[in-house]
Amino acid sequence: MKRWIKERIPRKLKDTVRLGQFLLVYFGSASPASTEETKRDQILAAILSVRRDLNEHTCAVEPPPDTVPFLQRLFRIYTEQKSYQPAPPYRTGAIWEEALRKWRKNYLAALESGNAERLRDVLRCFHRNDTIGAIGIEIEILRQLFLNPFRSACFVTNLITKYQAFPRVCDPRFLAFVDEGKFGCPVGVPFDGQKLTASGFRHAYYASEFSRAIDFDQKEDLVVCELGGGYANLPRILKQVHNSRSFTYVILDLPQMLPVAAYFLKANCPDSRIGLWDELRDGPLSRSELRKYDFVLLPNWDIERLPDGSVDAVINTASLAEMDRDIVENYLGQIRRITARGGHFYTVNRDRGVEYPELGGTRETGMEEWNLDWPGWRKKMDRPSWGDLHWGAWEQMGYKEVVLHRGG
């Protein structure tokens, strides 16, 4: 064992980690048929691969050839949306206003520049810069984590263990999508021919559990609406898994985030019909109009334009809790209004409110502060998020997974 440590573990690793603990996390992971030494080799190789990957700041993956004209269109839409001053419930909340200003400077500078080539270069590597993630700093969190040998070993082992558990707990069709693909150049753990990422697991899990909750395989001509869709990995997964089903996925988000979602969806689903604000701004947002598209991307305030009962299911994950309380109450009211009878609301959010001193003392409103006892609705699910998969970190942070069903 000592010889193996000396030969395989870099000097910095030996100097900074308690080796007994470091090696302990190897056992029980990797392939069940692997020998102990093979397991160790797999985990160590994965750690070193991620470290090398984190040092790469460029991306060899070329964007689709028509990206620049498409981004020029997105620039025009963004400029028009920013010139519109929404009513107070739809202005950026205190947490996001401060986070965008503080942690997404490079992305916002590219978005404000009007230079399509500059924005293209940012978006082609959006997983490796401040465009997305945990308030724009997910890649920095990952870099800091992999400076600590023991924490990085735990992270890698945890992802591999979750990967192996996934098909036993979730719908196995979604397992392939724990790999987020090539666009945006994600950084992940290489295993079983895939690149495993925490966000990939999260979105694959959401897609699986949402599909179960609404019995997706038995539905046709659905309109699904997500409030705060991020870079649109969840709709990508749902569209590719349920490719035999005809449905429309509507994303409502801040104007700053919609270009990322549009780029990602166009790159991954080039043949899909994507409806954007410039062609839907003035006309009605009736169900029949929405059904002309595979994806529809609209600014958050357009939720008021959706007719009563026009949506079959609404999704919100790790988003509403980041908003001010009056904004949350407004959105919950809108969700009740737009959801059709027999429809669903699927949400995963923090259960308890949390203050952020680094963001000027702004505070999240936890789900315990929301009123989800809606007349005519019943709870189909109310459990700690990741309970079945033992996603310990999120359980400790107090995230809950709730499904509400509106009576027919």
Where do the protein language model's features map onto the residues?
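Membrane-proximal basic amphipathic "stem/tether" segments
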Residues: M1-Q85
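Conserved Class I S-adenosyl-L-methionine-dependent methyltransferase catalytic core
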Residues: P86-K219
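Conserved class I S-adenosyl-L-methionine
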Residues: K219-G230
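Conserved SAM-binding loop of SAM-dependent methyltransferases across substrates and taxa
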Residues: Y231-S244
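S-adenosyl-L-methionine
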Residues: F264-P307
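A short SAM/SAH-binding and catalytic strip from SAM-dependent methyltransferases
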Residues: D312-D326
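A short glycine-rich, Lys/Arg-flanked "PGG" loop and its adjoining helix->strand segment in the class I
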Residues: E329-R341
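Conserved beta-strand signature within the Rossmann-like core of class I S-adenosyl-L-methionine
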Residues: R341-G353
